[in-house]
């Protein structure tokens, strides 16, 4: 989710690209629980730039995710996304939150074993995110009733236990992580090893552009 990415050649662009689409218009069967559009996230509040609880992605990434969903459904599961395109203003909000030592209301759920002042130095929070380029998605597996499966940790858990291949994760959680990774890898998604939920579609449609338009259906050009 919050990997450090190069800002060389980055363009902070407040105008949406015509190559974005709401995921629901591409595959409405994929579940959406857009965490930063509500208070259930590590900041404890709606995050700047999230005007609607919708997933927006560059079109090639959205189509690839739909292909992965077909395979996951065939296996008796479904995909659920937590975050997709993320405006730069949201990333800036994360950095401000991480720098506010007084606000610790979400520590027990999201970062119980790391001090808040270590979140930036240890790479959990960064000044740039691949999500702002539009081809990265935070995603998990659910059963067909849309109940999330055991993945070993919650989403956005700032801890080495969230590393995709952490050896302490065994049994069903290990099987679920491996299934998620293999299904997405087959469609061109690359996992971030430090976060089991974080995948980037390659090649990216906008590899050098960090967008800042708000998350809303109206912000995406037809």
Where are each of the predicted segments found?
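Extracytoplasmic cell-surface/polysaccharide-interacting catalytic and binding patches
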Residues: 11-84, 89-194, 203-222
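Conserved metal-phosphate-binding beta-hairpin within the catalytic cores
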Residues: 199
């Amino acid at each position: 989710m919050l990997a450090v990415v190069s800002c060389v050649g980055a363009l902070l662009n407040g105008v949406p690209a015509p190559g974005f689409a709401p995921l629901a218009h591409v595959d409405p069967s994929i579940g959406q629980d857009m965490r930063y559009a509500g208070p259930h996230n590590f900041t404890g509040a709606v995050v700047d730039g999230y005007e609607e609880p919708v997933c927006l992605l560059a079109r090639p990434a959205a189509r690839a995710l739909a292909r992965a969903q077909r395979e996951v459904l065939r296996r008796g599961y479904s995909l659920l996304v937590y975050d997709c395109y993320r405006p730069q203003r949201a990333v800036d909000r994360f950095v401000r939150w991480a720098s506010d030592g007084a606000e610790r209301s979400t520590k027990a759920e999201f970062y119980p074993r790391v001090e808040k002042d270590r979140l930036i130095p240890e790479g959990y929070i960064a000044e740039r995110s691949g999500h702002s380029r539009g081809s990265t998605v935070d995603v998990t597996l659910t059963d067909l009733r849309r109940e999330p499966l055991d993945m070993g940790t919650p989403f956005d858990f700032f801890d080495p236990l969230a590393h995709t291949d952490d050896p302490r994760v065994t049994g069903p959680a290990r099987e679920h992580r491996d299934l998620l990774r293999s299904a997405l890898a087959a469609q061109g998604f690359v996992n971030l090893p430090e976060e089991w939920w974080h995948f980037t579609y390659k090649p990216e449609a906008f590899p050098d552009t960090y967008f800042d338009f708000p998350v809303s259906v109206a912000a995406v050009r037809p």
